[in-house]
A protein has these predicted regions:
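Short connector loops at helix/strand junctions that flank enzyme active sites
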Residues: 1, 51-53
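A short, exposed loop/beta-hairpin motif centered on an aromatic-Gly-Thr core
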Residues: 16-24
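Short loop/turn motifs at secondary-structure junctions and domain boundaries
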Residues: 14, 47-50
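Short aromatic-glycine-(Arg/Gly/Cys) micro-motifs in beta-strand/loop hairpins
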Residues: 1-16
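A short, structured loop/turn motif at beta-sheet edges
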Residues: 1, 24-32, 60-64
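C-terminal structural segments of small proteins and small subunits
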Residues: 53-82
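Charged, amphipathic alpha-helical segments
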Residues: 30-44
Length: 82
């Protein structure tokens, strides 16, 4: 199992994960990141504002980014027909 650190970032600010979390595979890591981003977006929806400026960067113990998910890529929006 490898330890990864999930950092929440936008172009200005960042919220760093000092503890990290262990994952058995990259697939498990990707699923966790997707679930987490969607959970954060669900909270945004409940508050009436969706903020797509953010992303989660997963870094390994050496500090290399191994996976990034921008919030805007975590869901699909189906617009109302005109």
């Amino acid at each position: 199992m490898a330890r990864y650190f999930m950092h929440l970032r936008d172009s200005i600010d960042e919220l760093l994960d000092p503890e990290g979390q262990e994952f058995a595979s990259m697939e498990e890591l990707r699923k966790w990141v997707m679930f987490t981003v969607r959970d954060l977006l669900a909270a945004d929806i409940r508050n009436g504002l969706i903020d797509f400026r953010y992303r989660i960067d997963a870094e390994d113990e050496a500090g290399a980014i191994v996976y990034t998910l921008a919030f805007k890529h975590a869901l699909s929006i189906i617009p109302e027909p005109i």
